[in-house]
């Protein structure tokens, strides 16, 4: 065979291979390089708060003519707010504890708005509350009490940090007393108390 012919055929074959390789590369048969594309993935965790609803409270023992009765309710607060929370209580009515047209007076402090050791006049009947627990306001320590102020909220506890994993507990202690010289009409007296948890 003629050498020139062989050479021509070889050149044509090499050219054909080059064309085929180029086509294969463009079709994705080979990756000749790389390209990057970056994105940011984000999520917002917003502050939230919840409070449970404990059972209704029956003060005990029953008051027969004179004497006192006590009871308590514990509220659990959960929040992821890093600044913390506060707990306030209020009453539906003024005075809070009623039975029809009869009532117990809201506890009267010697210094209005300052919790104090429970003490009432023998001629009165009064109803009030205190607070206890790790986050109860220090003013309530030593088993001190306040009177409700109708629907005005009164702070009883706070924490300047997010709640623990199982939430934070605060116990509100209730007390009603009929003085030895007071004639309180019989009946079932009740107070509707609302606890409000708020993020700080």
What are these regions (language model features)?
Residues 1-7:
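N-terminal Sec-pathway targeting helices
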Residues 7-20:
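Bacterial N-terminal signal peptides
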